[in-house]
Amino acid sequence: MWKWILTHCASAFPHLPGCCCCFLLLFLVSSVPVTCQALGQDMVSPEATNSSSSSSSSSSSSSFSSPSSAGRHVRSYNHLQGDVRWRKLFSFTKYFLKIEKNGKVSGTKKENCPYSILEITSVEIGVVAVKAINSNYYLAMNKKGKLYGSKEFNNDCKLKERIEENGYNTYASFNWQHNGRQMYVALNGKGAPRRGQKTRRKNTSAHFLPMVVHS
């Protein structure tokens, strides 16, 4: 490169004095690094800009995605556990399930019966506890399939809640089975509780419609 500059300078300005050629050479030589430096900056700056913008966009992207993921996790957890509902369980046989102040479980036709107001609490995923608000008894089923009211929450009070195809709910004992079959909460055509051994999931006597209680 330097050889090119000297040769062409001499041929381009043959009539200039030697001192003028020297000054001209010095000027050309001093301008070359500046040009190279500017050219280098032009070549590097777009890549640096893209790199910084991509890193900033990636950090902003992660800052937006993280809270939403956490929010989804928290909302899912609250939905699955700790849910509390006040309901009346209206059976397919046209009775409201009630637990009287002596702990007796039966059905009633009276819509305003205070013992039919129930608090349904999710204790595990798909498992609930049903408690009569005015008698303070939990709905329970023992290993023989008998329904009774329990003052204390125990394993007999855990019921598996399932929404059936017809829109009604079924409640099966979480801990007890009969010959490998689920035992269900059920009221017969007279409003009396049925033994769990005689119930099946498809029996309409075991189907209940949760009705919202308005305060």
UniProtKB/Swiss-Prot annotation:
Transmembrane segments: none
Gene Ontology BP annotations: actin cytoskeleton organization; angiogenesis; animal organ formation; animal organ morphogenesis; blood vessel morphogenesis; blood vessel remodeling; branch elongation involved in salivary gland morphogenesis; branching involved in salivary gland morphogenesis
Family matches, as SMART domains: FGF (SM00442)
Sugar-bearing residue positions: N50, N203
Alphabetically ordered keywords of this record: Glycoprotein, Growth factor, Secreted, Signal
Sequence segments annotated as region (Disordered): 49-73
UniProt cross-references to CDD domains, sorted A to Z: beta-trefoil_FGF10 (cd23320)
Signal peptide (from-to): 1-36
Principal location listed in the UniProt entry: secreted
Localization terms from the record: Secreted
InterPro entries found in the cross-reference section: Fibroblast_GF_fam (IPR002209), IL1/FGF (IPR008996)
Compositionally biased spans, kind Low complexity: 51-69
GO cellular component: cell surface; cytoplasm; extracellular space; nucleus; plasma membrane
MF annotations from Gene Ontology: chemoattractant activity; fibroblast growth factor receptor binding; growth factor activity; heparin binding; type 2 fibroblast growth factor receptor binding
Tissue: Preferentially expressed in the lung in adults.
Subunit details: Interacts with FGFR1 and FGFR2. Interacts with FGFBP1.
Function: Plays an important role in the regulation of embryonic development, cell proliferation and cell differentiation. Required for normal branching morphogenesis. May play a role in wound healing.
Similarity comment text for this entry: Belongs to the heparin-binding growth factors family.
Protein name as it appears in the record: Fibroblast growth factor 10
Species for this entry: Rattus norvegicus (Rat)
